[in-house]
Amino acid sequence: MFRRNDTMKLFRATLVAVVLVALCVSSLMNAPAVAAAPKTITVATDATWPPMEFVDAQKNIVGFDIDFLKAAAKEGGFEVVFKNTAWDGIFAGIEAGKYDAIISSVTITDERKKTMDFSDPYINAGQILVVPKKDKTTKKLADLKGKKVGAQIGTTGAMEIKKNAGVELKTYDEIGLAFEDMAADRIAAVVCDTPVAANYALQRNEYKKNFKIVGVPFTEEFYGVVVKKGNKELLELLNKGIRQVKSKGLNKAIEKKWLR
């Protein structure tokens, strides 16, 4: 026989269970959300291109690009780890999945867009000509016909030299080697990005007495962060940070630190 008391006991037990479940759900809903760990992005850079990216006396990778991307990471809610990578293999590395992105003074070009994706531009830096101060006649690249002009291999500087018939291109693995050759009179001039030219010709004690910048930038070039073709998620994350840095004017302080 099923007695009434048994029914009441069952009802009370069920009611207690329902209340406990409700309290647990309410507690979970009101608990502070645990923040997701920031996404960490491994970024390749050829740290031989001061003041944009280089290794300092303490063996740290520093420079304009490094500070800019750190600021973008902070604004965009992600973290970055930098990996020093030689320029001649840097683009192949991203295809092979050795890292997630590249920030290394990479000029955005239509040709490069065919095989890789770029973030929003983060700085405009055109090519410019650096010559010895004793050179009183050179005003532009075309004036150097019959002479050797140096640039880093695979850069837009090297591409610009090739456009000038009669000017002999000499390429280098590192831009600093080109300036060393010019100091030793082995080449007549160097073509490089304006920020790099400013560093070597205007800031470095060993060169600023002997080198000068001539003319004005003869290209308009925008640097972007490179990601593997089709990686839209990472591109959106990077662009979010870049836009925040620029809209807040944080890039101005970074430019003042490295480019003035």
Question: What is each of the regions a protein language model found here?
Answer:
Residues 92, 104-114, 160-163, 188-219:
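A ligand-binding cleft/hinge motif common to bilobed small-molecule-binding domains
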Residues 66-75, 135, 148, 153-155, ...:
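Extended ligand-binding regions for polar small-molecule ligands
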Residues 47, 123-131, 194, 198, ...:
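Periplasmic-binding protein-like
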Residues 74-75, 83-84, 88-101, 115-117, ...:
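Short helices/loops that flank or line small-molecule/ion binding pockets
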Residues 35, 132-148:
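Flexible hinge/capping segments at coil-to-helix
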Residues 36-105, 114:
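Extracytoplasmic small-molecule ligand-binding "clamshell" domains
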Residues 66, 81-92, 136, 153-156, ...:
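Short helix-initiation/N-cap motifs at beta->coil->alpha
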Residues 36, 156-172, 209-214, 239-260:
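Ligand-binding clefts/hinges and TM-proximal coupling segments of bilobed small-molecule sensing domains
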